[in-house]
Structure formats: C-alpha cells, structure tokens
C-alpha cells in the first residue's frame, strides 16, 4: 500500500489553491463541500472562478504569483496550474513547511493525492489508484454508485440518532454489532430507502424494546431480473439481491444474473418450464409465506418484469392476505429489452403507432386471443412464450386480415451472448423456425417495424434474414 487512506477534517480551516483556471475550480468546489476556507493565489482567474468568488464568502483571491509566504497558517495546499515550475515550487515550499500538498496530475510532487469520491454524506467512499490511473478509479467509483444508493446517507443519520440508545440497551459490543448488522441490512434499511421514516423509527424502537435475537416477520422482495443481460438490472434489484437469505427463481433467470445473488443465500429452483413446473403456482405462493414467517428475507427473482406475464400479482395477493411485508421491483420486460437489442423499435412514426403484448401459450392446440384487435394496421404485436404456437399464431393473424407478407421476427435468448434473430414474414416464419431450431426463451415480433432490424441491429448477435425458396423474407 503506497498511500494511507485518511479522512482529513478541514472544516473552517484555511487552505491554499494556487491556480485560477478550470482545474483549480474543480478542486475549489471539492474543498467547499468539506467546508474549508479557501485562499486562491493566481495572477489571473477564469470567469467561472470570478463568479464563484462572488457567490461564496469563504473564498479569497490574491492576484499575485506564488510565494512561499502564501503557505503561512495553511492546513493544506493544492497546486493546480499548467506551469510545471510553479507547481514544483509550491510542492517544495509546502514540503519544507510540513504542509500537506497535492499537485494535480503529478503524484511525484504530492504528499497526498485526491481520490475519486462517492459522496453519500455522512457516508464517504474514496477510491484511488495511487495516481497511476485516475480514469480507472472513476470507473470503479461508478460501479459503486450502483451498489450504494443515495439514501445510505439518511440511513447513516438514523444510525447516529439511535447510537446512544443502542449502546445503553446492549452492554456487550458483539450484541451491538449483531443488532446493527440486522438493522442496516433488513426491513429497517428498506423503510428508510423507501422514505417511510415513521415506520422505520417504529421498527427500530420495537427491535430495541425486544432486545433479543428474535425479530419481526421477514419480507419478500419481488424483483424483475430483466431479459437476461445483468447490466440491465436496476440499482434496487442489485441491492436486494445482495441481502436476501433465500432466493426463489425459475428458468427465465439467466445464470449470469443468478451469479450476482448473495453467495451464501439458499437457492430454491421452482422450474416454470412449459407443462413441467417443479412447483405449481399455489405451492410457490405458500412457500413465500412460509419462509417470510420464519423471519427470512426472501428474494423472488423473475425474468423480465414481475407484473408482465410473470404472475407477480398472484404472489403478492397471497402475501397481502397473510400480512407479509413485500416490495416489488420492476424489471425491463422482454418486449422492451429484447426488441432494443435486436434493433427493432416497437413504435415508429412511419410504421407503428401502437404496440400490444400478448402471450402465445397453446391450450388444446389453440391460442385464445382477440384476433380482430391484433390484426389492426400500423400496430406492433409482441408475443411472449409463442414458440410452440407460432404456426397457429401466424395462421390466425393472416385469417383475420394481416397480409401474409407482414414482416415477423423471432429472437432467441435476447440481450445475452446467445441472442439469435430470425426474420421473415407471417407466411414464412413457421418454416424458418422449423428449419432452424431455437432455444427458449424466445420472443416473436410482428409488424412493419421488423423491416428496420437489418438497418438498426447493433448488438453482437446472430442475425439471419430468411424466407422461403420463392423469395425474400419480406419486401
């Protein structure tokens, strides 16, 4: 470790910034956030810095070239000029005076360096590459942004407010640690994140009253995992995935996403392959209730969005009947995510003014849909779970008025490295699929917007425009 990470209290302390340009302004704004008094030394300053001087009474400016006596009584110094000799002089003088000094973009002249900062005050996270690659440090910070929501600052304020009460309630440090670990990772934290301040305060007070390891009923997180690409997960989904005790998942959750769940969480697979459910839906509902009543934090992870053909509504109805706390986290539904990765806009001014989502499950070799409504012109049809019923689907759409030459596409495992796009028409698509076996999950898109696929496809996947021997896939 080349540097010792420390946090320096410079509130109401005098700090020197040498320089008057854009780089100096960035450092000054950072010092302002730490409530420092700032003394700027520079023969000339930028318009932006001039405006900052007018806005902030804690900034003063001396229109001179740097001299060592400018360092007198300063807590730290920052050299932010584009003149190497000036920067070297500031560094040498500060070192001689025993004052911490930072020279922007020159670690060799620094006695301290400025990290990339994630500010969730009073929580502060600093990331540093030791001056070797500031860009890499910023990239790492951006990853942390996804894992540490802004509400963590409020959570820290709550912890500070109750710290003395917790210390009085729990004599032994180990018990205090256990208490705070449960509070800061459980329902209390989620209440704070959701802005339910009174409920959070009541929950914490009740936990203190009980002062045992027995906590109230658990909670269920109904989370949409999106169409497959882990990068499409929401911040909230990622956070809840890391604090679950148990995860209940099905086939539509990709392995890459499942790998992001807390490693020591118990995993329960509930199937959801057509006609081969490992557990029927009623049993899944009952399992969620049972686990939550045991005090567990249960992650119900569903592909896509839990409220779009995901039966999420049925599950939370059962939870509500049993007074089980729950949260619902939306996910990017397959229609939106897969179409985007396939380069097929679902609406387009020249091609489609409406879009409809339907499920293509076969029942007794038929699909029960409002066919006249689906066969309207200037409309995009997105069919979930339609692979086995594609022949019936295309036949009915043609029978109810759509042209046989209407463009159609089927996308295999969209948004993942295994994505594959086949395009054709209502007339040709069943034969195309017959000749090119696909692996579920798949999504079917019907409408003139499919014509745009070849032009707009951007994701690195297999794309195969196809038709029959009599002609191209579509006009």
From Swiss-Prot:
Pfam families: CysG_dimeriser (PF10414), NAD_binding_7 (PF13241), Sirohm_synth_M (PF14824), TP_methylase (PF00590). The modification Phosphoserine is found at residue 129. The active site is at residues 250, 272. NCBIfam families: cobA_cysG_Cterm, cysG_Nterm, PRK06136.1, PRK10637.1. Disulfide bonds: none annotated. S-adenosyl-L-methionine binds at residues 227, 303-305, 308, 333-334, 385, 414. This is Siroheme synthase. Its EC number is 2.1.1.107, 1.3.1.76, 4.99.1.4. In the N-terminal section; belongs to the precorrin-2 dehydrogenase / sirohydrochlorin ferrochelatase family. In the C-terminal section; belongs to the precorrin methyltransferase family. It comes from Nitrosomonas europaea (strain ATCC 19718 / CIP 103999 / KCTC 2705 / NBRC 14298). It catalyses: uroporphyrinogen III + 2 S-adenosyl-L-methionine = precorrin-2 + 2 S-adenosyl-L-homocysteine + H(+); precorrin-2 + NAD(+) = sirohydrochlorin + NADH + 2 H(+); siroheme + 2 H(+) = sirohydrochlorin + Fe(2+). HAMAP family: Siroheme_synth (MF_01646). SUPFAM superfamilies: NAD(P)-binding Rossmann-fold domains (SSF51735), Siroheme synthase middle domains-like (SSF75615), Tetrapyrrole methylase (SSF53790). Residues 218-475 are annotated as: Uroporphyrinogen-III C-methyltransferase. Residues 1-204 are annotated as: Precorrin-2 dehydrogenase /sirohydrochlorin ferrochelatase. NAD(+) binds at residues 22-23, 43-44. Pathway: Cofactor biosynthesis; adenosylcobalamin biosynthesis; precorrin-2 from uroporphyrinogen III: step 1/1; Cofactor biosynthesis; adenosylcobalamin biosynthesis; sirohydrochlorin from precorrin-2: step 1/1; Porphyrin-containing compound metabolism; siroheme biosynthesis; precorrin-2 from uroporphyrinogen III: step 1/1; Porphyrin-containing compound metabolism; siroheme biosynthesis; siroheme from sirohydrochlorin: step 1/1. It comes from the Bacteria. The lineage of its organism: Bacteria, Pseudomonadati, Pseudomonadota, Betaproteobacteria, Nitrosomonadales. One of its GO terms (biological process) is methylation. InterPro entries: 4pyrrol_Mease (IPR000878), 4pyrrol_Methylase_sf (IPR035996), 4pyrrole_Mease_sub1 (IPR014777), 4pyrrole_Mease_sub2 (IPR014776), CobA/CysG_C (IPR006366), NAD(P)-bd_dom_sf (IPR036291), Siro_Cobalamin_biosynth (IPR050161), Sirohaem_synt_dimer_dom_sf (IPR037115). One of its GO terms (molecular function) is NAD binding. Keywords: Cobalamin biosynthesis, Lyase, Methyltransferase, Multifunctional enzyme, NAD, Oxidoreductase, Phosphoprotein, Porphyrin biosynthesis, S-adenosyl-L-methionine, Transferase. Then it catalyzes the NAD-dependent ring dehydrogenation of precorrin-2 to yield sirohydrochlorin. Finally, it catalyzes the ferrochelation of sirohydrochlorin to yield siroheme.
């Amino acid at each position: 470790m080349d540097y010792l990470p420390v946090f320096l209290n410079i509130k109401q302390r005098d700090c020197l910034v040498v320089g008057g340009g854009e780089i100096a302004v960035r450092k000054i704004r950072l010092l302002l956030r730490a409530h420092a008094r700032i003394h700027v030394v520079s023969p000339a300053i930028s318009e932006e810095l001039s405006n900052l001087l007018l806005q902030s009474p804690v900034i003063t400016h001396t229109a001179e070239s740097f001299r060592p006596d400018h360092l007198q009584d300063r807590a730290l110094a920052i050299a932010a000029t584009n003149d190497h000799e000036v920067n070297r002089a500031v560094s040498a003088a500060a070192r001689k005076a025993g004052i911490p000094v930072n020279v922007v973009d020159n670690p060799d002249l620094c006695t301290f360096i400025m990290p990339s900062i994630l500010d969730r005050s009073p929580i502060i996270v600093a990331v540093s590459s030791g001056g070797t690659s500031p860009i890499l440090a910023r990239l790492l910070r951006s990853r942390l942004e996804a894992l540490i929501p802004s509400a963590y600052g409020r959570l820290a304020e709550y912890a500070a407010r109750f710290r003395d009460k917790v210390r009085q309630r729990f004599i032994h440090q180990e018990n205090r640690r256990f208490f705070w670990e449960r509070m800061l990772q459980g329902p209390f934290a989620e209440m704070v994140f959701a802005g339910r301040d009174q409920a959070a305060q009541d929950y914490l007070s009740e936990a203190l009253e009980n002062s045992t390891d027995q906590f109230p009923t658990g909670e269920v997180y109904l989370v949409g995992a999106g169409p497959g690409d882990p990068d499409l997960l929401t911040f909230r989904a990622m956070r809840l995935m890391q604090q679950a005790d148990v995860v209940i998942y099905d086939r539509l959750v990709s392995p890459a996403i499942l790998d992001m769940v807390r490693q020591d969480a118990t995993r329960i697979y509930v199937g959801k392959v057509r006609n081969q459910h490992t557990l029927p839906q009623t049993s899944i509902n009952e399992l969620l209730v049972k686990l939550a009543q045991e005090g567990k934090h249960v992650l119900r992870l569903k592909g896509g969005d839990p409220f779009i053909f995901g039966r999420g509504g049925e599950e939370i109805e059962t939870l509500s009947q049993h007074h089980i706390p729950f949260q619902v986290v939306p996910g990017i539904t397959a229609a939106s995510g897969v179409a985007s990765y396939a380069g097929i806009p679902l609406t387009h001014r020249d091609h489609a003014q409406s879009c409809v989502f339907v499920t293509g499950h076969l029942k007794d070799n038929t699909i029960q849909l409002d066919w006249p409504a689906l066969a309207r012109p200037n409309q995009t049809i997105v069919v979930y779970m339609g692979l086995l019923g594609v022949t019936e689907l295309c036949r009915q759409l043609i029978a109810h008025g759509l042209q046989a030459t209407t463009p159609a596409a089927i996308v295999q495992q969209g948004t993942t490295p295994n994505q594959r796009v086949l395009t054709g028409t209502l007339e040709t698509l069943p034969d195309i699929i017959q000749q090119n076996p696909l692996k579920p999950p798949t999504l079917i898109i019907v409408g003139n917007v499919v014509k745009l696929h070849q032009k707009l496809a951007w994701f690195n996947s297999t794309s195969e425009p196809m038709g029959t021997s009599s002609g191209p896939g579509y006009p």
